Amino acid sequence: ANGLDMGSIGAVFITHEHTDHCSALRVLAKRYGFKVYSSLGTLNALRAGNKLDPNTDADVITDEVVIGNMRVQRIDTPHDAAESCCYRVTAPDGKSALIATDMGVMLPDVRTAAEQSDFVVLESNHDINMLKNGFYPYPLKQRILSNRGHLSNEACAKELVNLVEKGTLRLMLGH
């Protein structure tokens, strides 16, 4: 990010091992020395895929961890990865944000965390008809449309209506 002192980053949380989420992880973690947190499955996949230097300080987050004065909660998500998750971050004043992308469906635990958050980033990945009629190979279409793929725009919209009805005021779409 523009103006961000990368050396001030103490920890990075990885949701899953797909390259679009961690392509620079190995280099940045080595250069700046921040700690990496993820699920055990993701950490093992990162190491097996040579996406994380063996000497990088890394730890498994099973439920939640406190970093400085922030509490970070891990919530499992359904995605075609080793052990994907999303994260809910809570500040000392109780304000919280949930970042939930790369999931085929909205599981009850993710929905509950979203309903309890002040700010929610939610995946809005594809228009179902455009995807079905698009140029992607059939196996990729099936992967995206599966319950371990990506949340459709329609499914996201239904979740957003629920969140607004529950009182969530700050929402952002993610991809």
Regions found by a protein language model. Name each.
Residues A1-L4, I61-F119:
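Core dinuclear metal-dependent hydrolase active-site scaffold
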Residues A1-S38:
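Active-site metal-binding motif and surrounding structural segment of the metallo-beta-lactamase
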Residues M6-I9, A29-Y32, D93-G94, K166-M172:
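Short, surface-exposed connector motifs at secondary-structure boundaries
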Residues I9-E17, Y37-L40, L98-D102, V121-E123, ...:
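Active-site neighborhood of phospho(di)ester-bond hydrolases with catalytic His/Asp-centered motifs
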Residues C22-S23, L46, L107, M130:
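Glycine/Thr-rich phosphate-binding loops of Rossmann-like dinucleotide-binding domains
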Residues T42-A48:
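Short, charged/polar "capping" segments at the starts of alpha-helices
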Residues P108-G174:
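Cap/insert and terminal regions of metallo-dependent hydrolase folds
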